[in-house]
Amino acid sequence: MENKKTIYFLCTGNSCRSQMAEAWGKQYLGDKWNVYSAGIEVHGVNPNAIKAMNEVNIDITNQTSDIIDANILNRADLVVTLCSHADSVCPSTPPDVNRVHWGFDDPAGKEWSEFQRVRDEIGERIKRFSETGE
């Protein structure tokens, strides 16, 4: 079997957006990609992110909030920043690491409907990537 590629989702606190992206990534990309997420800082997994993903039958209670791991970052096939802060302060990556920015609003501290909206937007974006490679 061919080695899987690695995708690394990054946001500021590895609390909401990147946690959701990791979960969606495992669902849509898991057969071809190793999927990880991390943050510039560690804020813990937001309970509303867990609740939002449970609504779509994806359990992220065992996911952890992690700081960027240089080993994963430097070996990833694709690094995806999910917020402008992570995009601007993300450590440099080697030239062979493809880095893209997919911006999503931060639902933390906002109404419940924002968690649902951002969850669905991230899921749709990753599904599209799984189908088109873009």
Swiss-Prot record:
Compartments it resides in: Cytoplasm
Chief localisation class: cytoplasm
Keywords noted in UniProt: Arsenical resistance, Cytoplasm, Disulfide bond, Oxidoreductase, Redox-active center
Catalytic residues as annotated in Swiss-Prot or TrEMBL: C11, C83, C90
Pfam families listed in its UniProt record: LMWPc
One Gene Ontology biological process: response to arsenic-containing substance
GO molecular function: arsenate reductase (thioredoxin) activity; protein tyrosine phosphatase activity
CDD domains reported for this sequence: LMWP_ArsC (cd16345)
Superkingdom per UniProt: Bacteria
Gene3D superfamilies noted in UniProt: 3.40.50.2300
SUPFAM superfamilies linked to this entry: Phosphotyrosine protein phosphatases I
Functional summary from the UniProt entry: Catalyzes the reduction of arsenate [As(V)] to arsenite [As(III)].
Identification of the protein by name: Arsenate reductase
Organism of derivation: Bacillus cereus (strain ZK / E33L)
Gene symbol of the encoding locus: arsC
